[in-house]
């Protein structure tokens, strides 16, 4: 193992750089999964373009921190400008304002904190968890990403106040079930607070019906957050925007540019319709960060949890300029075409099954030898996936769907 190969303590004297690189080649690289490999089909697409890698390299070398606008004006202004470019590419209206977080986990946590405070009239900011006499309820799909559940816990809602809403045959959240759950909580004296919908679930790329969910959210005063971490990138392709029809009814949405779009990790873009809720919750203004331009500029420390910020916008800016919108659209269309082709091959094969719709580039499939079912089929699925992953020839992701093991394959292995 790597731990056994490394010394138990740091060297007292510096070592030659060649020796460090030698250890990278001999010790580190054999223990890594190569996410940039052309046959890496696992987890989710996260292939960083060369232009974004170079932008990230420059950002690290510059070493600037976005504590405030004044600490590095170009950092704040490039982020604001670049995210407005991306907003236009996604087809979002000018009412949306963006900020870069690290991952979708943080973006969803920020959204639920904002939802909590708006619902409680900011009582929890003033009085903590004791400032609310009735439980605040969060509604999520049974197929929502695990980060949504974690965000609700970290935001203080409590596991007992998270409602898992049933899905339909396409694994999308059922609005009727959501409405029933809201009515039950109102009857019980609870306070419905937020609903997290998903545009492109992790396991099946299911598309929750945002327009119907948004109508319910507005009717009952719920904050609607949309997790479109992976699928959101597809909205730069105009013919895909039907997938998030109703997005303008949402209060916030997350799109991970470090996934399918091709920006080097990490670069999670969080858009919010009314930034005052975000700023009111996150704002800090110690004397050593104040300047004469406060109130005239966007201080990004008030748009998220950390005080310090990396210059993440630089790698996004590099990629957008080097690639251009048309090339990015062409790459995503290629990936979706490849997924449709592969889905046709799976459907045509008698010993393979396709287990969910393929709206984008994710396939849920299973190899089914004749006469094999149940636990034997589960064991077979896990075994062939593990053999493939161990071979180094390709990488796929085993997962559970409807209580049975399947395999996820993403057809976007290279930019």
Please identify what each model-predicted range represents.
Residues 1-95, 386, 390, 394:
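N-terminal entrance/gating region of PLP-dependent enzymes' catalytic architecture
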Residues 103, 107-279:
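Conserved PLP-enzyme active-site core in the AAT-like
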Residues 152, 217, 346-347, 388-389:
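A generic structural signal for well-ordered alpha-helical segments
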Residues 211-215, 341, 383:
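Alpha-helical scaffolding segments of alpha/beta enzyme cores, especially the outer helices
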Residues 245-350:
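Active-site C-terminal subdomain of aminotransferase-like
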Residues 354-388:
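Conserved PLP-binding catalytic core of the aspartate aminotransferase-like
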Residues 357, 362, 390-408:
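Conserved PLP cofactor-binding pocket of PLP-dependent enzymes
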Residues 410-415:
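Conserved small/polar residues in nucleotide/adenosyl-binding loops
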């Amino acid at each position: 193992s790597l731990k056994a190969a490394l010394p138990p303590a740091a060297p007292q004297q510096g070592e030659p750089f060649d020796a460090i690189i030698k250890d990278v080649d001999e010790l580190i690289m054999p223990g890594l999964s190569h996410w940039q490999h052309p046959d890496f089909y696992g987890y989710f697409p996260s292939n960083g373009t060369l232009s974004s890698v170079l932008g990230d390299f420059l950002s690290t070398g510059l070493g600037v921190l976005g504590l405030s606008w004044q600490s590095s004006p170009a950092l704040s202004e490039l982020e604001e400008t670049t995210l407005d470019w991306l907003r236009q590419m996604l087809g979002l209206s000018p009412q949306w304002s963006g900020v870069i977080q690290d991952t979708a986990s943080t973006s969803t946590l920020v959204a639920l904190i904002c939802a909590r405070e708006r619902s409680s009239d900011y009582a929890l900011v003033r009085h903590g968890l004791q400032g609310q006499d009735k439980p605040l309820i969060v509604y999520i799909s049974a197929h929502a990403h695990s980060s949504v559940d974690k965000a609700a816990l970290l935001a203080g809602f409590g596991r007992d106040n998270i409602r898992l809403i049933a899905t339909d045959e396409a694994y999308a959240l059922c609005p009727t079930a959501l409405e029933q759950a809201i009515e039950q909580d109102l009857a019980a004296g609870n306070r419905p607070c937020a609903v997290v919908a998903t545009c492109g679930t992790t396991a099946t790329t299911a598309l929750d019906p945002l327009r119907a969910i948004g109508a319910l959210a507005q009717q009952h005063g719920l904050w609607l957050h949309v997790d479109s971490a992976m699928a959101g990138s597809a909205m730069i392709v105009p013919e895909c925007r039907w997938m998030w029809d109703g997005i303008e009814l949402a209060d916030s949405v997350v799109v991970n540019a470090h996934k399918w779009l091709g920006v080097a990790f990490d670069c999670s873009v969080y858009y919010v319709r009314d930034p005052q809720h975000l700023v009111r919750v996150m704002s800090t203004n110690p004397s050593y960060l104040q300047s004469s331009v406060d109130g005239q500029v966007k201080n990004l420390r008030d748009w998220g949890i950390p005080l310090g910020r990396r210059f993440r916008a630089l790698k996004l800016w590099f990629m957008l300029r080097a690639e251009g919108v048309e090339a990015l659209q062409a790459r995503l269309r290629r990936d979706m075409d490849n997924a449709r082709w592969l889905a046709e091959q799976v459907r045509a094969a008698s010993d393979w099954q396709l287990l969910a719709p393929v709206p984008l580039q994710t396939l849920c499939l299973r190899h089914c030898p004749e006469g094999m079912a149940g636990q034997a089929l589960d064991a077979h699925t896990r075994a062939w996936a593990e053999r493939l992953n161990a071979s180094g020839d390709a990488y796929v992701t085993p997962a559970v769907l409807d209580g049975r093991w399947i395999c996820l394959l993403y057809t976007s292995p290279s930019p």
